[in-house]
């Protein structure tokens, strides 16, 4: 039995990943940094290791190294941006010292996808569809605005979950808002605001070292929170061959090996699809792939261990809810009673939940509690809602 270690195991995706791995026959351990969290109560995690936060990177890597010295781990899989970046930066050292496999690309490749401006600059150079995007600094505000146009959004180069993203409609808006975002999140880009229909797409792919796609899933995201654009709380798995083809071409250009996740928006007026960002880690909605026949966690483990992996049989048509976040959507959305399918459709043959299930209900309850507590914190609420 292989031993799998999840980093950032407190996140919601750890529930889906642990469930998929455990049902496939692996032993699952997880580094958890938050007591009130999904992973803290997930029944599919065999061992919980209370770990420091990734913010102190040196301490975190020392802690990880000490753990690997005392325990056999075959594969490490990061669940979130911070741990994915740390693992990628230290991949060569960890694999050499501990004979462990790190399920993350080498850092030069990882950084091109993780960094918002670098990833879209690659799209610009290679002709992949994307919104006009430019690096933003206090010295180039007018130049960036002239290239991107208005309305636009200021987006931190390194962030997740819509944190730090604000809309601007004039140079005066940029001058007023940019310094605040820069102080909190660091370097930013200015990106043209896409007037979209309210629906966006999430494309998950796995590219092998031979350059073959051995797994893919497309989510049509219909409800998300924050309402201005954020994490999926209701989506459906669909077929969309052109999206898969575009994203696969981007991964080919990157010489990517491993799992990747794309966010794509459709322009309301033209119907054109544009890549918004690339996430080089497992998304919260990974369970949508699993219930549609694509077991990405197993694909990841088998591929990094050098085993042969066959293409998965993708069976779309499933609905996936993130109940804790969907509750927040219901509280804030003016469409709460008009939306179709109805928010009150809790059960059905093809309805699934990413934050828990009947056999593992506690993560859903814990997620609701921790989510409410986070939104009571003014700084977190402002980063998400701007209020």
Regions found by a protein language model. Give the residues of each.
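ATP-binding N-terminal substructure of ATP-dependent carboxylate-amine bond-forming enzymes
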Residues: 1-103, 367-384
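Short glycine-enriched loops at secondary-structure junctions
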Residues: 32-37, 81-83, 209-213, 219-221, ...
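Residue-level detector of structured alpha->beta connecting loops
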Residues: 72, 99, 149, 185-186, ...
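Active-site nucleotide/adenylate-binding loops and adjacent lid/helix of ATP-dependent enzymes
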Residues: 110-197, 207-212, 241-245
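Peripheral (often C-terminal) accessory segments that flank ATP-dependent C-N-forming ligase machineries
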Residues: 142-144, 302-387
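ATP-dependent carboxylate/phosphate-activation module, predominantly the ATP-grasp catalytic core
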Residues: 172, 180-181, 192-255, 279-305
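A short glycine-rich, hydrophobically flanked beta-strand micro-motif that places a catalytic Asp/Glu
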Residues: 257-269
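Conserved protein kinase catalytic/activation segment
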Residues: 271-273
């Amino acid at each position: 039995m292989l031993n799998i270690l999840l980093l950032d195991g407190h996140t919601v995706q750890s529930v889906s990943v642990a469930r998929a791995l455990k049902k496939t026959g692996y032993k699952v351990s997880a580094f958890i940094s938050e007591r009130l969290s999904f992973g803290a109560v997930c029944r599919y995690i065999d061992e919980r290791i209370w770990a420091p936060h990734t913010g102190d990177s040196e301490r975190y890597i020392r802690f990880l190294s000490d753990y690997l010295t005392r325990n056999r781990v075959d594969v490490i899989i990061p669940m979130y941006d911070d741990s994915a970046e740390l693992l990628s930066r230290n991949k060569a050292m960890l694999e050499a010292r501990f004979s462990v496999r790190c399920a993350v690309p080498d850092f030069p490749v990882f950084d091109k996808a993780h960094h918002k401006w670098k990833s879209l600059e690659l799209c610009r150079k290679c002709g992949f569809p994307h919104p006009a995007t430019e690096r933003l600094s206090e010295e180039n505000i007018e130049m960036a605005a002239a290239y991107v146009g208005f309305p636009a959004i200021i987006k931190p180069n390194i962030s997740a979950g819509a944190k730090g993203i604000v809309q601007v409609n004039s140079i005066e808006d940029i001058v007023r808002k940019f310094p605040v975002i820069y102080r909190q999140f660091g370097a930013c880009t200015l990106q043209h605001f896409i007037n979209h229909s309210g629906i966006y797409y999430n494309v998950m792919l796995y590219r092998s070292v031979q350059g073959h796609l051995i797994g893919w899933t497309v989510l049509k995201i219909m409800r998300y929170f924050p309402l201005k654009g954020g994490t999926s709380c209701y989506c459906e798995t669909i077929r969309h061959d052109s999206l898969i083809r575009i994203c696969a071409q981007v991964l080919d250009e990157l010489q990517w090996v491993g799992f990747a996740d794309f966010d794509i928006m459709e322009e309301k007026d033209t119907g054109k699809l544009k890549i918004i960002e690339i996430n080089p880690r497992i998304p919260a909605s990974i369970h949508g792939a699993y219930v549609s026949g694509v077991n990405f966690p197993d694909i990841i483990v088998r591929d990094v261990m050098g085993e042969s992996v066959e293409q998965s049989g993708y069976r779309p048509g499933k609905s996936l809810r993130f109940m804790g976040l969907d509750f927040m959507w219901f509280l804030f959305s003016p469409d709460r009673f008009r939306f179709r399918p109805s928010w009150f459709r809790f059960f059905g043959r093809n309805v699934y939940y990413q934050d828990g299930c009947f056999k593992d209900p506690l993560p859903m309850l814990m997620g609701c509690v921790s989510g409410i507590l986070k939104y009571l914190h003014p700084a977190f609420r402002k980063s998400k809602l701007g209020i």
